[in-house]
Amino acid sequence: MNDQSITVRGKDRYKSGVMEYKKMGYWEPSYQPKDTDVIALFRVTPQDGVDPVEACAAVAGESSTATWTVVWTDRLTAAEKYRAKCYRVEPVPGSPGSYFAYIAYDLDLFEPGSIANLTASIIGNVFGFKPLKALRLEDMRLPVAYVKTFQGPATGIVVERERLDKFGRPLLGATVKPKLGLSGRNYGRVVYEALKGGLDFTKDDENINSQPFMHWRERFLYCMEAVNKAQAATGEIKGTYLNVTAATMEDMYERAEFAKELGSTIIMIDLVIGYTAIQSMAKWARRNDMILHLHRAGHSTYTRQRAHGVSFRVIAKWMRLAGVDHIHAGTVVGKLEGDPNTTRGYYDICREDFNPMRLEHGVFFDQHWASLNKLMPVASGGIHAGQMHQLLDLLGEDVVLQFGGGTIGHPRGIAAGATANRVALEAMILARNEGRDYVHEGPEILAKAAQTCTPLREALEIWKDVTFNYESTDSPDFVPTVTPAA
């Protein structure tokens, strides 16, 4: 689209007044991105009557060096280098009026190792730009030179499995329910019953911090007492995600230190604390040999809508840089948003050393992760034992499966719910290891396991008809098609 540069050169470039962005050097269709460039892919929807190339050039300008008028101080900088360059504009398939804008940024525009600084440019003022109806950051290519300035996940999948001594299967967890209102003693009872019944982890929910019905210190004490008792009863290493999210960094450090003193192996934070706080807690976790779980609370306010916001695949990349060990990444079959192909893309970003471009998964760029640890994805929200074959097929084994209601809602009690999930998982892993087609035989495998496990039989009966089959609001723009044979 309009593959000729129209940049104004020489003294005319710096005449006072207003100049189109595409003439100021922010539209360079002949530009070849360098290996060290940060590349962003935006979905741009211009206002009616706005030239698409001008709109995309404006995104490049407003997310780097431009303002609304020519300023003479540009001549005091290496302006040609520091201007972001939109080098490619394409219509979005199936979305009339929207365009993909590929924009390259020189690496020197960004402070090393700072998500806050990166986002201040890439998703800063530009999202409020009036000539745009909508703007969405779809994907980013982060150069190795930039990736290496971040610590990455504090623990990583391999070391986490070694600490837990659990291999070859997904980890099992449950979020304590109800998420609000329990006393510390009753909260601890839920943790104990779930861990004793067969789960590896329990977790706080995103909004349980330190409220009048249960202060944080009380919760930590009862939870760790439950963990220690469950470990003694089962002979397995157990854990519970203690949410240290708080009003200030000082409060969060205090809570994390107390969790460490009590012997916890894992702490939890919420996405809403912000990028700087997340990176700060990740550095603390690495120094203190603690697994760091991130709940993506709040993400759907800007990731769910297809036309405007930030794709979760970008958030996943930022969080892998930032250094968390766990991140909620969708279930496909549960109650929360999650197109199968899009969700696979999220999981690939978390778990691969190198992400090749996979347009069918919404991944637009090759991404090298250098030596950064892998990030453990977490599946939670509306899943139950009857879906175990689907979960294993869709999400693989390096994942934490969180059955909250699917554990605590069991008619025979919490421990029975945990046992049902553990037996269902073990049966499916055994079938997979035997080479069986566990995806198609899944219901049969579960039914056979239920013959000798009353809790599983009851779980399959009570939740057999529960599905969440709604159309996804965020699916890939490119769908693979079969080429007919000649």
Curated annotation (Swiss-Prot):
Alphabetical list of PROSITE patterns matching this protein: RUBISCO_LARGE
Pfam families in the record: RuBisCO_large, RuBisCO_large_N
Top-level taxon of origin: Bacteria
InterPro entries the UniProt entry points to: RuBisCO, RuBisCo_large_chain_AS, RuBisCO_lsu_C, RuBisCO_lsu_C_sf, RuBisCO_lsu_fd_N, RuBisCO_lsu_N_sf, RuBisCO_lsuI
GO MF term (any one): ribulose-bisphosphate carboxylase activity
Keyword field: Calvin cycle, Carbon dioxide fixation, Lyase, Magnesium, Metal-binding, Monooxygenase, Oxidoreductase, Photosynthesis
Enzyme class, UniProt record, top EC level: lyase
Annotated catalysed reactions: 2 (2R)-3-phosphoglycerate + 2 H(+) = D-ribulose 1,5-bisphosphate + CO2 + H2O; D-ribulose 1,5-bisphosphate + O2 = 2-phosphoglycolate + (2R)-3-phosphoglycerate + 2 H(+)
Bound cofactor: record note: Binds 1 Mg(2+) ion per subunit.
GO process terms (BP): reductive pentose-phosphate cycle
Subunit structure: Heterohexadecamer of 8 large chains and 8 small chains.
Family: Belongs to the RuBisCO large chain family. Type I subfamily.
UniProt miscellaneous comment: The basic functional RuBisCO is composed of a large chain homodimer in a 'head-to-tail' conformation. In form I RuBisCO this homodimer is arranged in a barrel-like tetramer with the small subunits forming a tetrameric 'cap' on each end of the 'barrel'.
Name of protein: Ribulose bisphosphate carboxylase large chain 3
Gene field: cbbL3
